[in-house]
Amino acid sequence: RKLWDNYYVPYVKGYFSAFGRFRSDDVKTGNVLGYVGSTSSATFFPTQVSDDSGAAYDIDLKVLPCPKFKDGDDYAVQQGAGMVVTKGSEDEIKASIEFLKWFTQSENNIEFSVGSGYLPVTKEANNIEKIKSVDSDISSSMEEILTESEAEINDNNLYYMHAFENGNDARTVLQEAFGDTAQQDRNTVDERIAQGESAEEAEAEFLSDEYFEQWYQNVLSKLQAYEG
């Protein structure tokens, strides 16, 4: 219920929004003021906002810690692209291993991180002073991103979604249950307001305990299909 109250409810009330494929796109068009995103997404963060008239305004990036529930434990999500050595010839496998060894050396990995926003993969390289010593040309925005990210890693327990059969399908269930449902219901609220209802009247159906319980039981039944 806490997730519902802190994601779905403000979304239906119009406090949260999602229009483009990525939230950094929504910042660029001025539709949102901030978002929770990955470190790599910050490399696409715009320096200007353009409104419907075509006028452009300069903006600055401010990086903040990921939000947490009050009195909650210190956890942060760890997610991103990975590398594996696939089946191949003996020479291909050896070459792949050598590349991974080279790529994960601190200096090489830091160069990649500064350019992409992906975090270094070793504890030694996840240090902003070490990063700046390797790449002195780091931009102010990337320095801010990596500095905050270092703190997130060191001050939190990192977790990730464990692999299980049909795990992507289960994840899609949750995405549709939260994101898609919230957007659809917000669209309905907008339509009702356009027809003359007050915001309170238009939102009432979706903010009831009955609506939450119906939603919860529906999601629960879908997720139970993936139990091992």
Label each residue range with its predicted role:
Residues 4-8, 24, 28, 97-104, ...:
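Non-transmembrane alpha-helical segments in soluble domains
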Residues 15-29:
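Short helix-initiation/N-cap motifs at beta->coil->alpha
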Residues 150-228:
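Conserved C-terminal helix/tail region of periplasmic/extracytoplasmic solute-binding proteins
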Residues 29-41:
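Alpha-to-beta junction loops
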Residues 1-18:
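Glycine-centered hinge/linker elements that transmit conformational signals in sensory
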Residues 9-13, 50-123:
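Extracytoplasmic/periplasmic substrate-recognition and gating elements
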Residues 124-157:
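An extracytoplasmic/periplasmic, membrane-proximal ligand-sensing/linker region
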Residues 39-55:
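A ligand-binding cleft/hinge motif common to bilobed small-molecule-binding domains
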